[in-house]
Design a protein with these regions (language model features):
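Fe(II)/2-oxoglutarate oxygenase catalytic core
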Residues: 1-214
């Protein structure tokens, strides 16, 4: 179950602590104007102690109290992006041409640059930086949030509907059944090459260009 897999596994809890500490440190710098995150200085200082142990390779599961484990699993802040009536999908792209390219390819694969509008992209980036919902770890050293576990909000659902209404000939009457967001450390392995089961699978990256050194 969640507790055993994520809170009592050394690699998993180390990943959670690292993300939790770095995220709360970022929020505390007030870059995105976040208020009322509901974490105490005592909690933050304990996270810092554990984080430093992880960084100098001296962390042990016994360093972590049962109370701290459960606190790390709690969602402290989850304010969704504001929703507007504007399409979140960038219609400056040649939609008809992109649809034809997808439908004519075998297998059906399509690469789109600048999928979102600049405003939608900015809102989604702020949400991913600040929403304290990334409580699930994976073997590649990354954390995730899921539609049924903190990610469901009006912005995400409108984004799904805007995709369908913009690319009508690709999505037709399909419904969104699952969505997730992953965060990766640049020094970890990340996700192996794979294909998820879906009629149409959409993957997009919102990392700022300046963070991409490739």
């Amino acid at each position: 179950d969640y507790i055993q897999k994520h809170l009592y596994n050394k690699k998993s809890i180390s990943t959670l602590i690292t993300h939790e500490y770095e995220q709360l440190t970022f929020i505390d710098k007030d870059v995105d104007g976040i208020r009322n995150t509901k974490f105490t200085n005592e909690y933050y200082q304990e996270l810092k102690r554990l984080y430093l142990k992880i960084k100098n390779n001296s962390f042990d599961l016994n360093d972590l109290s049962s109370t701290m484990r459960l606190n790390i699993a709690k969602i402290l802040y989850n304010k969704p992006p504001n929703v507007s009536s504007q399409n979140f999908i960038n219609e400056d792209n040649d939609i008809k041409k992109l649809e034809s390219e997808y439908l004519d390819s075998k297998p059906e694969v399509l690469i789109v640059d600048n999928l979102l509008t600049p405003d939608a992209l900015k809102k989604l980036q702020i949400f991913c930086r600040t929403a304290n919902i990334f409580k699930y770890t994976h073997n590649g050293g990354y954390v995730g949030a899921y539609l049924s576990r903190g990610l469901a909000n009006e912005f995400m659902l409108k984004l799904s509907e805007d995709l369908k209404s913009t690319f009508k000939n690709i999505f037709n009457n399909l419904k969104l059944t699952q969505a997730w967001i992953y965060k990766y450390e640049s020094t970890k392995e990340g996700v192996n090459i794979h294909a998820d089961p879906a009629v149409v699978n959409v993957n997009f990256w919102i990392t700022p260009d300046e963070a991409n050194l490739d």
